[in-house]
């Protein structure tokens, strides 16, 4: 059995906190910006869809391969968003590390779970995420200064974009490391 840990970064004009993940991903302007993954114990790989990269065909095949378990922190979000974007994947093949953690009495939240089980600093979630999500994944107000644009794209701040890519990859590493700690305690 293969294992594929996944994290995506997305954007949509729909406020996910107010409307929920389904409405967010159903928006006409919904987009997956990047897709990071770790196959088994191989290094994390990043696919920057926003810059024209494509998910490797082998990985696309694994998304609906019953012999590959997909893992994510809040797996329902990744599953639904990937399906909305045309990558068909069966929910029964997914395992939610957040659910697994809370089932065991650990706190929810990738960072809090990692801290609670004491994972090494180089495996933890990066703290830069919220401001990067606000910059790239939430519409910006059009102003004279920003040329009237409603979205920030990678070329608007390459340094921030690079950090956002690192953040996405590190989320996969954090989820994978947490799962390695939790897998001895099966969820029925």
Predicted regions and their residues:
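Entry/capping segment at the start of metal-dependent catalytic domains
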Residues: 1-31
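Active-site-proximal helix-loop-helix substrate-binding element of RNase H-like nuclease domains
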Residues: 32, 37, 41-183
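Acidic catalytic cores of enzymes that act on phosphate-bearing nucleotides/polynucleotides
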Residues: 185-188
């Amino acid at each position: 059995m293969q294992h594929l840990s996944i994290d995506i970064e997305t954007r949509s004009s729909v406020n996910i906190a107010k409307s929920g993940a389904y409405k967010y991903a159903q928006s006409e302007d919904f987009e997956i910006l990047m897709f990071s993954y770790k196959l088994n114990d191989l290094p994390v790989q990043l696919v920057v869809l926003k810059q024209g990269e494509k998910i490797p065909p082998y990985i696309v095949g694994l998304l609906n391969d019953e012999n590959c378990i997909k893992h994510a922190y809040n797996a329902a979000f990744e599953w639904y968003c990937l399906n909305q974007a045309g990558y068909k994947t069966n929910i029964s093949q997914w395992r939610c590390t957040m659910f697994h953690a809370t089932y065991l009495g650990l706190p929810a939240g990738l960072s809090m779970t990692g801290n609670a089980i004491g994972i090494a600093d180089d495996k933890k979630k990066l703290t830069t995420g919220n401001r990067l999500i606000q910059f790239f994944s939430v519409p910006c107000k059009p102003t004279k200064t920003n040329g009237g644009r409603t979205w920030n794209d990678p070329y608007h701040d390459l340094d921030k974009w690079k950090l956002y890519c690192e953040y996405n990859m590190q989320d996969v590493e954090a989820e994978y490391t947490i799962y390695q700690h939790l897998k001895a305690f099966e969820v029925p």
